[in-house]
């Protein structure tokens, strides 16, 4: 089988976003971050545990008709730090780049500390400092290391 045959296991998209080099097994978490649950009508292709020289195994997500916001890319970088984002228009890659981990994410994660000011009826957006081993709430210092997708705020 040629390299081209392997690359076309998932068909090309006309317009939208391709998220490549996601660590194997993380594609469903990427869909959760993007709020894609199958009910919105988004056309999505997912390839999981594909062979990868760089990662061993990788996942790929293709979303037709949608370009990611910077907030989405920032949160995505927390669970897929090696991901590459490709913007597709008329079947051509018009923009390509690796995700960059921000130093802070704001308003996209929910603090698990029930006593944190961001979880009460206060008009305060959550704010987390991004570290190498997790994220830390800047209000109560609670650290989230595991299951980050479970703490994503619904839009």
UniProtKB/Swiss-Prot annotation:
Family in the record: Belongs to the PyrI family.
InterPro entries according to UniProt: Asp_carbamoyltransf_reg_N, Asp_carbamoylTrfase_reg, Asp_carbamoyltrfase_reg_C, Asp_carbatrfase_reg_C_sf, Asp_carbatrfase_reg_N_sf
Source species, domain of life: Archaea
One GO process term, biological-process aspect: pyrimidine nucleotide biosynthetic process
Keyword Metal-binding: yes
Protein name listed in UniProt: Aspartate carbamoyltransferase regulatory chain
Annotated residues for binding of Zn(2+): 111, 116, 137, 140
Keywords of the record: Metal-binding, Pyrimidine biosynthesis, Zinc
UniProt function note: Involved in allosteric regulation of aspartate carbamoyltransferase.
Cofactor note: Binds 1 zinc ion per subunit.
Gene encoding the protein: pyrI
Keyword Transmembrane helix found: no
GO molecular-function term, one example from the UniProt record: metal ion binding
Species this protein is from: Haloarcula marismortui (strain ATCC 43049 / DSM 3752 / JCM 8966 / VKM B-1809)
Subunit structure: Contains catalytic and regulatory chains.
């Amino acid at each position: 089988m040629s390299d081209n045959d392997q690359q076309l296991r998932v068909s090309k998209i006309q317009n939208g976003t391709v998220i490549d080099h996601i660590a194997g097994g993380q594609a469903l978490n990427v869909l959760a971050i993007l709020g894609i649950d199958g009910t919105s009508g988004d056309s999505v292709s997912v390839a999981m545990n594909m062979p990868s020289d760089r990662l061993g195994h990788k996942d790929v997500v293709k979303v037709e008709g949608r370009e990611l916001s910077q907030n989405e890319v920032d949160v995505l970088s927390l669970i897929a730090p090696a991901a590459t984002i490709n913007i597709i228009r008329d079947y051509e890659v018009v923009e390509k780049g690796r995700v960059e981990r921000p130093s802070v994410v704001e308003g996209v994660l929910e603090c698990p500390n029930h006593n944190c000011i961001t979880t009460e009826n206060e008009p305060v957006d959550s704010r987390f400092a991004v570290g190498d081993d997790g994220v830390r709430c800047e209000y109560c210092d609670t650290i989230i290391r595991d299951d980050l997708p479970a703490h994503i705020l619904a839009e």
